[in-house]
């Protein structure tokens, strides 16, 4: 990953509201493939993922389907149970000392002209996370000033409704490298499951007014971004 030695940034950080909630940490890296280089980037991301997993790291790589940048965007995520575990990650960069296979990969990645870094940040989970192979839809919100707790409570209410229709929901808080954002992550085991859940949600009379509160009235803050990604097998 380009300049990974310098940009290992935490996607979610702890705050006054995460105490008692945090169940995991994620480091997130966005990359964009250059025209004609998508297949090369796919192979490069898979190679790094396989090295990381073989070393015991919980790593998932995704390709974006919908969102800014379209199918040229790629997402690399490292998951950790704690900051102590993160400090002992499989391809440790403490003192710039790497495992040999990871160092070779870093050199290959940084010399590649197939992609460019877009963003990196850290997150902290605010509930139990559901790592796995899913179709992933993400909505990132910026709570109104002084109303973080209100937005989080509304998001937790929404989670109950969505999970009642078959979605798995993860809630994260952005940290270092990003803003004070809340991220609502909708996980589906397949396209068919996603379609079934979405249709049920459209017909849910409890959700209809809450959807207006979020999107039309902007009662809980500003929508920062939304996108869909799927795992690179």
Question: Residue spans of the language-model regions?
Answer:
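Short alpha-helical segments used as structural interaction elements across diverse proteins
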Residues: 2-3, 219
